[in-house]
Amino acid sequence: MDPAERAQAARARVPRIDPYGFERPEDFDYAAYEEFFSTYLVILTKRAIKWSKLLKGNGGVRKSVTVKRYVRKGIPLEHRARVWMAVSGAQARMDQSPGYYHRLLEGESSSSLDEAIRTDLNRTFPDNVMFRKTADPCLQKTLYNVLLAYGLHNPDVGYCQCCAQKPGSSAGLRSSLTGMNFIAGYLILITKNEEESFWLLDALVGRILPDYYSPAMLGLKTDQEVLAELVRMKLPAVAALMDGHGVLWTLLVSRWFICLFVDILPVETVLRIWDCLFNEGSKIIFRVALTLIKQHQEFILEASSIPDICDKFKQITKGDFVTECHAFMQKIFSEPGSLSMTTITRLRKSCRAALQAQS
C-alpha cells in the first residue's frame, strides 16, 4: 500500500472528531496518528490497570512518591478528574465549602463581568462540537457558570479576557483569543462537572499560578523572564540569538504560559502536562518550554530575523515530537536537566524586582 492509500485508509478508520469533541484539522496526519496511537493504547491499558489498583477502596489519593511516578506516566481519562481534584487540593477546598459554588451563582453579578464572559462564549473552542449552540447539551452554559462564579469568587482577577492584539502591541501579553475561558473549557471537558471545574480553576489561578491572571499579570510577566534566564543558563546560543535580534520573550511564549499550552499543543499532550502541573506545580511549565526549545535548538538557530524567529517558535509546537505525548513527557523530565524550585524561586524574586523597578 503506497503512502496515499495508507493515509486514506487511516482517515477512514480514525474518527474525524476526537474523544474530547474536537474536530481534527484538515491537515491532520491520520496515518501517523494511527501508528502512534496503536502503541500508546497498549501503554494506556497498562496504566489503567495500575491506577485502578491504586485507587481501589475509599482511601483517596494522597501525594506520594508512588503517585508522582504514576502521574508522570499519565492518568487514565476515567480517573483524571478524581486525581486532579485530590492532588491539587481542589477536593479539600470543595469539601470545606459545601454549597459555596451554588451560592455564588445565586448572588448578584455585575453587568461588565457578564458581558465580558458572554463575549467569549461563541469563540471558545469553535472546533469543538460540545461547545456549539446546536449541541445537546451545549457546554456554553456550563462554561458561563464556571467563569461567572470564579469572577465573583476572586474579584481581584475577575474574568481575564485575553483579547486579540497585534504582536508587539502594548497589550501583547493578551495575545490571541485564548485565556481563562479555554482553560475552564478543558476542565469542563475532563470533569463533566461544573462545580469541580470551578474548584480546579481556583487551584490553578489562585495557588498554582498566582498573579498570572491578575490585571497587572505580574506573575505571568515574571515567569516569562524566568524562562529567559533559564534559557540563558542552559541554552546560551538561543539566548544570544534572542539578544542579537532584540526579541522580547513575551512575543514568543506568552500564549504558552497564559493558555497552559491549550490550543498550542495537541489535546492529549496538554492533558498529560496538566496531570503533572496539578501534582507538581508551575515548574512543569518551565520543563515543557525548555524541552521544546532545546529539542529544536538547531532549527531555531537557523533564524535570521525576528519574523523568522517567531515562525520557528510556532513550528516547534507541531509535529510528531509533540503528538507522541508519552515520549514527550519522558523528555521533559530529562532534557532540561536539573530544575529545582529553589532555583525558580530565586529567579522569580530577582525578575519580579526588575519588573517592578521598570514600572
Curated annotation (Swiss-Prot):
Summary of the tissues where the protein is detected: Highly expressed in testes, expression greatly increased at postnatal day 20 and remained high up to day 90. Moderately expressed in kidney and liver, weakly expressed in intestine, lung, ovaries and stomach. Expression of Growth hormone increased the expression in testis but decreased expression in liver and kidney.
Organism name: Mus musculus
GO molecular function, one term: GTPase activator activity
Database matches in SMART domains: TBC
Key word NAD present: no
Function comment: May act as a GTPase-activating protein for Rab family protein(s).
Protein name: Growth hormone-regulated TBC protein 1
Keywords on record: GTPase activation
